[in-house]
């Protein structure tokens, strides 16, 4: 409450007192001494007092600023963009469509929560009046995005009316009570690992593409995070391919195994800075996983169940080993997809003979036949694959030269490095011989 409002209220009370004081004195002295002038206006005084009092308390409630804060547009927009990734696209609970602004604890905290994934981040700014408000995420995000690049002032009152001001632009919107918002669950910060933001971002990038994109098998919509002998193993699969990354951890950690939703990892990868000098703390419980980095906290429910047992699959024998330049191989496969119409699943055929691998594609659009040099050990082989699956794996491999291991036309191929820090398993597809 500012000084002008305070003085207005004092003056109003002052007037009420001197208006009612004569009536009160007259009543104290008994009706026999009650002055006729006072009695004539007594009923009017009572109604007036009731109306003025009601108006006063209504004004007191709605006119007082319940929250006021100032922060730069860039800080605010960055925070809103981070937490908005946890706002559900569809929900029956309107409060979950909001971003919570909490300025009650000496810092400005933004939170969004869809009950499966919750994100909280702290932004820099000045708190003039402490308070809390929930604002529609889509509207608020667009408002902030389109404001001038200057300081933004956010004010609210008891009726949740929110005024957002920046330079000469002023938005008025109605928010919701922050008391109804679902806060992030309290997670015990005891069982954890520490890795760099760069490493986590890379691990997600190199595995996320092969998770299942439907809920026929919910477990496959997530990724396995397994720690064993201080090695973090991350696995994803959609049933037709498997992606695996191994990371040696610097410190000693207890063994653990959890399934993290792909949506959670996808959103985290967009937030991480990718800085090798900045770390991420990852905390594990039976039901949740928590990622803590910079000024941001991400909490996600885990997927319950048993993940695929892949150890026996990945240790399969091979009869043909090929070493090939990754960039040349990828470019050739990419060219072949020009002949495939959307929705038409045509395989690319690898005809491996001596030191040459011939790539063939045949469709109603046309055909492709291209040779690339390889180093081969073992038998000649002809095998077909979905070109998209090969492209997805090759795009995330940073090595200049890759190694492909194959057994027969019906067995999966393995793309891996010598240390097996990454392994990509891809099932072959049937094909007819290209003329």
Regions found by a protein language model. Give the residues of each.
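Hydrophobic, low-acid, alpha-helix-prone terminal segments
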Residues: 9-12
């Amino acid at each position: 409450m500012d000084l002008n409002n305070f003085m207005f209220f004092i003056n109003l009370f002052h007037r009420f007192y001197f208006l009612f004081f004569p009536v009160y004195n007259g009543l104290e002295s008994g009706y026999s001494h009650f002055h006729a002038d006072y009695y004539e206006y007594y009923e009017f005084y009572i109604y007036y007092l009731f109306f003025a009092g009601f108006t006063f308390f209504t004004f007191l409630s709605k006119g007082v600023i319940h929250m006021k804060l100032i922060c730069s547009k860039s800080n605010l927009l960055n925070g809103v963009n981070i937490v908005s990734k946890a706002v559900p696209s569809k929900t029956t609970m309107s409060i979950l469509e909001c971003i919570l602004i909490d300025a009650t604890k000496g810092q400005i905290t933004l939170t969004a929560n869809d009950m499966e994934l919750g994100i909280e981040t702290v932004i820099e700014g000045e708190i003039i009046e402490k308070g809390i408000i929930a604002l529609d995420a889509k509207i608020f995000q667009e408002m902030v995005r389109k404001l001038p690049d200057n300081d933004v002032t956010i004010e609210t009152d008891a009726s949740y009316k929110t005024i957002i001001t920046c330079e000469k632009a002023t938005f008025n919107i109605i928010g919701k009570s922050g008391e109804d918002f679902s806060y992030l669950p309290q997670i015990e910060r005891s069982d954890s690992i520490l890795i760099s933001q760069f490493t986590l971002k890379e691990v997600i990038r190199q595995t996320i593409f092969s998770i299942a994109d439907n809920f026929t098998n919910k477990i496959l919509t997530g990724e396995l995070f397994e720690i064993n002998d201080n090695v973090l193993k991350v696995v994803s699969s959609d049933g037709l391919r498997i992606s695996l990354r191994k990371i040696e951890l610097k410190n000693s950690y207890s063994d653990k195994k959890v399934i993290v939703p792909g949506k959670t990892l996808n959103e985290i990868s967009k937030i991480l800075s990718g800085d090798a000098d900045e770390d991420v703390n990852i905390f594990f419980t039976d039901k949740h996983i928590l990622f803590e980095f910079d000024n941001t906290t991400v909490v996600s429910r885990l997927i319950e169940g048993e993940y695929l047992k892949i150890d026996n699959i990945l240790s399969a024998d091979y009869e043909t080993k090929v070493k090939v330049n990754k960039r040349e191989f990828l470019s050739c496969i990419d060219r072949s997809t020009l002949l495939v119409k959307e929705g038409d699943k045509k395989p690319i055929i690898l005809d491996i003979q001596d030191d040459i691998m011939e790539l063939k594609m045949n469709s109603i659009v046309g055909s492709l036949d291209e040779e690339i040099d390889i180093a081969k050990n073992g038998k000649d082989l002809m095998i077909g694959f979905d070109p998209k699956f090969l492209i997805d794996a090759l795009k995330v491999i940073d090595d200049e030269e890759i190694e492909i291991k194959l057994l027969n036309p019906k067995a999966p191929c393995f793309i891996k490095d010598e240390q097996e820090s990454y392994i990509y398993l891809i099932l072959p597809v049937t094909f007819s011989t290209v003329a």
